[in-house]
A protein has these predicted regions:
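A short, conserved beta-strand element in the Rossmann-like catalytic core
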Residues: 13, 129-131
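Short phosphate-binding loop-to-helix
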Residues: 70-119
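A C-terminal functional module that forms or caps the active site or interfaces directly
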Residues: 232-267
Length: 312
């Protein structure tokens, strides 16, 4: 069965000193974080990659990774496709609000793929390193898809303490699960910081401790082709319910929408636990740590010095 990896790479990179953080080189040979995610996905069995980008970064993106990955994937019988997240791509009858410059969010990003997604797929962020285990587990879940399982999703569940930055606050989906390992709620939580005790939410310099051992969503979801129509319907509802005060800032976020479907009893989400340590370039200061982390993974034999050599 064909399975697709969707990579959300349209982010502006506002926290990374003005640069396009998804394209920052971190590997021995100039690889970026996406290279490692693509390698791990192909190794796990995914055979199609969809890049979600903006048209205004298309040339920089193709120069940094797109053209190179296309050549590698051609030799591995892995399909490459592009989708473009644009502010003006809105439901029929909806006009772009005057003054709106902020992207519509991760739900809108995935919706940009509707013309190129016809199979079970995983969604990831471009600037997060997830580790190999999660890709294997998501792939093995997705290949069991049948149309009767259209509303059965999955999610990679990371341990919160393994997903924090040393250099500032992060946003994570804090998850609740039942005894069978299914997601019961996901709470999008901002301003999570690392503390000597574990983790806390920083609200105007007042710290509120949270459980560092809880599951966190890193926007790594396993979804079905039928979800695309559901996602489009949800985007229309998002506009119908959006007040004038939210028109310039409101976002259609994937974890929040999936949680709404969960609470309505419309879907199930199996949490696939992973003990791999996340890292990523949320802040410019994170880059040195990420570079050293990849060098250590290569030294330990997790990756080859020439990254894709072992897939040939």
């Amino acid at each position: 069965m064909r399975t697709t990896l969707v990579i959300m790479a349209a982010g502006i990179g506002s926290r990374f000193g003005g640069g396009i953080k998804q394209l920052a080189p971190v590997g021995l040979n100039g690889e970026i974080i996406m290279d490692y995610s693509i390698h791990d996905a192909i190794e796990a069995g995914f055979n199609k990659i969809v890049f979600i980008i903006r048209k205004d970064i298309k040339d920089a993106f193709k120069e940094a990774i797109g053209d190179r990955i296309e050549k590698i994937c051609n030799n591995l019988d892995v399909e490459i496709a592009y989708a473009y997240q644009e502010l003006s791509e809105l439901p029929e009858g909806v006009e772009l609000p005057t003054g709106r410059t902020k992207p519509w969010g991760t739900g809108h990003a995935v919706l940009a793929c509707k013309e190129v997604l016809h199979e079970p797929f995983a969604v990831i962020n471009a600037d997060d390193y997830y580790g190999k285990e999660a890709f294997v587990k998501l792939h093995d879940f997705l290949v069991c898809y049948t149309p009767e399982k259209a509303n059965q999703f999955c999610m990679a569940g990371f341990i919160l303490k393994n997903t924090l930055s040393e250099n500032g606050a992060v946003t994570r989906g804090i998850c609740e699960t039942n005894e069978e390992g299914y997601l019961t709620a996901v709470h999008e939580t901002s301003n999570i910081v690392k503390t000597p005790e574990g983790a806390a939410v920083d609200n105007d310099e007042q710290l509120t401790s949270i459980n560092a051992e809880s599951y966190a969503s890193m926007n790594m979801w396993g979804l079905t082709p039928e979800f695309m129509q559901t996602l489009e319907d949800g985007f229309k509802e998002f506009f119908a319910n959006m007040g004038d005060k939210d028109i310039l800032k409101a976002e259609y976020l994937l974890p929040i929408y999936i949680d709404e479907l969960l609470q309505a009893g419309k879907v199930s989400v199996k949490v696939l636990d992973t003990n791999d340590k996340w890292f990523g370039v949320t802040y410019k200061e994170d880059k040195d740590y990420v570079v050293k982390s990849f060098a250590k993974l290569i030294e330990d034999g997790v990756y080859q010095k020439n990254l894709f050599e072992d897939l040939k």
